[in-house]
UniProtKB/Swiss-Prot annotation:
ZnF RING-type: positions: 760-800
GO molecular function list: transferase activity; zinc ion binding
Superkingdom of the organism of origin: Eukaryota
Extent of Low complexity compositional bias: 221-231
Biased composition range(s): Basic and acidic residues: 423-435
Domain notes: The RING-type zinc finger domain mediates binding to an E2 ubiquitin-conjugating enzyme.
Organism: Arabidopsis thaliana
Pathway info: Protein modification; protein ubiquitination
Gene Ontology biological process terms, A to Z: protein ubiquitination
Name of the protein described by the UniProt record: Putative E3 ubiquitin-protein ligase RF298
């Protein structure tokens, strides 16, 4: 009680004191009820997750009757006790069925509205801004008509105060909670699962749920009162008595409190007028009024209007149970505020903060499980357990399931569920019997216990008798409760049977429609098969045409590509032709210049021949150096071989000899590479000079062929004289140079015998006899070819192509 008072005080303090102090003393609560839901958990670390609702205004109100306070206190008790009904498995099952039906209705209505040309978002916003659909026609027609009228009126749909739902599922969840709350406001004696059952059998029509015959549901309408008085630990609401036997049904509350058709997203407002009982005026507006005419027996229902202000902004992720508890607490707070003695001024809620911190569904379920387990522990601790008697342990084993059955009774138990009856074992050899419900008279459990006639009580002799005296009354209570549940289930079966009989004509019509639809489907299937066949033929023809068109396009693209390539080749050929013409013109000019300068070439020819001779001498010297280098290399290799053979004999000196050998090899290789590199560079240089000189000489010989032979003969003698006269500016010629010069002179003497075009390009004396492949050039004689191959020259002297094979050719002279 103190905790509840602190929650209400904190609630009023958070709202800034605009609603009043909200500190009226809460009515006494049932002390045995320890698992009540705690909505205000003062946890400062989670204060940022508060749920804030939009601002709204409450008009001036002044209570003049203490009856209002009594009604509000009774309603507070009923609402707090009904919070457990959402956790009932049967209620959860009904909730799933109602949610599925309501979602189907909303989607059907949205499809009809969307057929009129509206988008899905606009339709969803318009539906969330419409009324609660309590008209006389079906729910889908109400939604469609109200939403279309709202859309055609041109009101703004996207306002922050009108649209409070993020998706259709959230709209369905909140709508279901509103319908259940509205039914329970009109019928305060109904529990949550009973209100759900009424909505289910009435196709979610709130008016029909109000008008359902009370005789059909009288067994379940006062289950909360009988449950709280007889079995405080049970979590379900078994039917106990009728509405007339329930002294706690708040009848005056239904006459004094106003209920209006609520818009989606709104909680119903409480009474905003003075209490009709206090002022003496006849209540002109009731939550729901049912009048029975004597002659016609008709019933009329009317609902008052409600304010269009939004009281709550639905928050994503909040369960239906939490939304119902929020609504109940808001009603309690407003009733307390209205019941104050002084006047109530107009105020605005800065933020309707319900919980100090947001609790997830897992936290709520775990808290409830802890409360339920504490209740079970309390019940079990009241029963003394025997520790020494074997018969007592057998009784305890048979009695403990009875407690579990009591703590976990489902909303609609199965027919084969065992009843919580404690059975005894006569001996250890007899099998253990399961508790069952039977129509036979119950055995007398007190037969073995002595009875004191003077005191009128049974006197237990041991702990077993004490346990029997305690468990037999509980067994009777459970049997009575089981019988109530059986009657309740039979009543529900009767209601379902009546509902099924009402739906028989509709089922027949639906079967007929199904047969017609099946015939139409077969005809449509045959037509579709023919259409598919024609379509496949057309697609095949279209594919063939498309493939042919693609091939044509590919051919066109290929021809265009070839045309562009040919254009580029033609342009390149034109450029090459112009370049060739330019080169021919330049060659012609050079020939003319050479013809003019032919007289001066005679003097230069002698100088070139002398230079050629000196270059040949240098080549011979380099060849000798190369031979010496090879000899030295052979010597080094022989030395290395000797050292290698010596290493096998002298293992102790292997490391030193290896180092020395490595050094010698490095020096020899370095020297060899240096000599080879130098010789190759010199040979290449001399060969290039020789080729250049030969080219110039051949050009001169072509110009003056007749004078060339005479000049060559004279030139041999002149060379000897020139060599003698040239001793002034040259050093002494070595013996090998003189010998090579004599050989060259002899070759020059025999030069006239070989045709110029058949001379070797290196020695210019022998006839060309070696063919290089793959270039097929024949430029060297056999001797020069051997020298060329020994020097590791792999390029053709004529075209510089790679020589893959050398062929020795012989030609017969004719």
């Amino acid at each position: 009680m103190v905790e509840k008072q602190e929650e209400m005080n904190e609630f009023g303090a958070v709202n800034g004191g605009k609603v009043g102090t909200s500190s009226s003393v809460s009515p006494p609560q049932d002390k045995g009820r320890k698992n009540k839901r705690k909505l205000a958990d003062p946890s400062p670390q989670n204060a940022a997750s508060l749920t804030e609702f939009p601002r709204y205004e409450l008009h001036s109100f002044k209570s003049q009757s203490p009856l209002c306070e009594n009604d509000s206190n009774g309603q507070l008790k009923a609402e707090e006790s009904d919070s457990v009904g959402w956790d009932d498995p049967f209620a959860c099952h009904l909730e799933g069925l109602l949610s599925s039906n309501l979602l189907t209705l909303f989607r059907s209505a949205m499809n009809q509205i969307m057929d009129c040309g509206y988008s899905e978002d606009v339709v969803l916003k318009a539906i969330s801004s419409s009324r609660f659909y309590c008209g006389g026609t079906d729910l889908v027609s109400n939604i469609v008509n109200d939403t279309l009228s709202f859309l055609k009126s041109g009101k703004k749909v996207a306002g922050s105060r009108d649209y409070v739902f993020e998706d259709l599922q959230q709209l369905v969840a909140y709508s279901l909670v509103e319908k259940i709350s509205l039914v329970r406001e009109v019928r305060p004696s109904l529990s949550t699962d009973e209100a759900m059952w009424r909505l289910l059998i009435c196709d979610l029509n709130v008016l029909k749920a109000f008008e359902v015959d009370a005789d059909g549901l009288e067994g379940s309408s006062v289950s909360n009162a009988s449950k709280s008085s007889e079995s405080p630990v049970a979590e379900c609401n078994p039917p106990k008595s009728s509405d007339a036997d329930n002294p706690k049904a708040p009848v005056s509350n239904t006459q004094s409190k106003q209920s209006e058709p609520v818009k989606f997203g709104n909680f119903a407002n409480v009474n905003n007028s003075k209490n009709p009982h206090a002022s003496g005026a006849t209540p002109g507006k009731e939550v729901f009024s049912v009048s029975t005419a004597s002659g016609e027996g008709t019933k009329s229902a009317s609902l008052t209007s409600v304010s269009d202000e939004k009281l709550v902004s639905c928050r994503k992720g909040r369960t239906k149970k939490e939304m119902a508890m929020l609504r109940q607490k808001s009603c309690v707070e407003k009733i307390r505020t209205y019941s104050k003695g002084g006047g109530y001024k107009t105020a605005k809620f800065g933020g309707f903060l319900v919980e100090k911190r947001g609790k997830s569904a897992s936290d709520l379920l775990s808290a409830q499980a802890r409360n339920s387990s504490s209740k079970i522990t309390t019940e079990v601790m009241k029963i003394p357990l025997a520790e020494s008697s074997s018969t007592l342990s057998n009784s305890t084993k048979s009695d403990s399931p009875a407690l579990d059955v009591k703590e976990h009774v489902t909303a609609l138990p199965a027919n084969n569920a065992p009843a919580p009856v404690a059975s005894e074992k006569k001996s250890g050899s007899e099998p253990e019997e399961k508790p069952s419900v039977s129509t036979k008279p119950a055995p007398d459990y007190y037969a073995a216990i002595p009875y004191d006639a003077t005191l009128g009580i049974y006197i237990p002799r041991n702990k077993r008798d004490e346990l029997i005296l305690k468990l037999v009354p509980r067994m009777k209570d459970l049997q009575k409760e089981l019988q109530d549940w059986t009657d309740w289930a039979n009543q529900k079966v009767k209601q379902a049977t009546v509902r099924l009989l009402k739906d028989q004509p509709e089922l027949k019509a639906l079967r007929k429609e199904k047969e017609e639809a099946e015939e139409f489907r077969k005809e449509k299937q045959l037509l579709e098969e023919n259409t598919i066949k024609r379509r496949s033929e057309m697609e095949l023809a279209l594919n063939n045409a498309t493939n042919q068109l693609e091939r044509t396009n590919n051919t066109i693209r290929r021809l265009e590509l070839e045309q562009s390539l040919l254009k580029r080749e033609r342009e390149a050929a034109n450029i090459r032709a112009s370049e060739s013409a330019e080169s021919c013109r330049e060659a012609k000019e050079r020939v003319q210049r050479l013809l003019k300068n032919s007289q001066s070439w005679e003097g230069q020819k002698n100088l070139l021949q002398e230079e050629l001779k000196s270059q040949r001498d240098k080549v011979a010297g380099l060849q000798q150096e190369v031979a010496k280098a090879k000899t030295r290399q052979n010597q080094i290799e022989a030395t290395w071989k000797q050292e290698k053979s010596a290493t096998g004999k002298l293992t102790a000196q292997a490391a030193a000899l290896k180092k020395e050998r490595g050094k010698l090899e490095e020096l020899g290789k370095a020297e060899e590479e240096r000599i080879k590199t130098k010789a190759e560079n010199d040979v290449k240089y001399y060969i290039e000079n020789i080729k250049r000189l030969d080219t110039e000489i051949s050009k001169l010989k072509l110009k003056s062929d007749s004078l060339k032979i005479a000049a060559l003969k004279k030139g041999i003698d002149g060379n000897n004289d020139g060599n003698k006269s040239g001793m002034n500016h040259t050093t002494n010629t070595k013996a090998n140079s003189m010998a090579s010069a004599k050989v060259w002179e002899n070759n020059q003497g025999a030069e006239s015998k070989i045709k110029r075009e058949r001379e070797c390009v290196m020695c210019l004396s022998e006839e060309m006899s070696v063919i290089f492949l793959p270039c097929a050039h024949q430029v060297l004689c056999s001797k020069c070819n051997q020298l060329h191959e020994k020097e590791a020259m792999e390029d053709c002297p004529s075209c510089r192509a790679k020589i893959q094979r050398r062929i020795q050719a012989r030609f017969a002279r004719g």
